[in-house]
Amino acid sequence: MTNDTLSHVLRNINVSKGNIVRTVGNLEAILIKNHRTVKISANGNKYVNYYEYLILLKDGKKAGIILKCDNVDIHIYVYPKYRNQKIVSRLTGDGFLKKLWPDIDSISCKNLLEFYKIRHLAQIQGFTLRVQSEIEERLDRIPLE
């Protein structure tokens, strides 16, 4: 699922349909199971799927979303104004995602700009970071100023 789609879901999802599963200071994580999500493809076909989301709140306001993709992976989106505040790390520390979704054991990252954040998340969750060596090789080729 793209960041644009996750942003749209986050804007429109009703957090009252979920349950608070974790609170850390002024942060809350709300789990919403079996949320009906409609996607329309480029050719106009409509696809309906049911997903599990973890909504991240800061001071009661939606800050981010974590999508559980079947038993394979997770996707994370945080609104730009909430980035670099360690919201995901604080709410998911101590292997919380691994406890919440024990069938998930890895995370992938294809975005060089987010690599270090995703690697940190993988480490605190006990996940394997897929394609880590490929990304590290690409980073090594970037000239330092």
Predicted regions mapped to residue ranges:
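A short, internal acetyl-CoA/4′-phosphopantetheine-binding micro-motif in the GNAT/acyltransferase core
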Residues: 73-87
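Conserved beta-strand-loop-alpha-helix junction that forms the acyl-donor binding cleft
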Residues: 106-123, 127-128
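Conserved catalytic-core motifs of GNAT/GCN5-like acyltransferases
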Residues: 110-111, 126-142
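A short, well-structured alpha-helix characteristic of acyl/acetyltransferase catalytic modules
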Residues: 1-36
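Conserved acetyl-CoA-binding loop-helix of GNAT-fold acetyltransferases
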Residues: 84-100
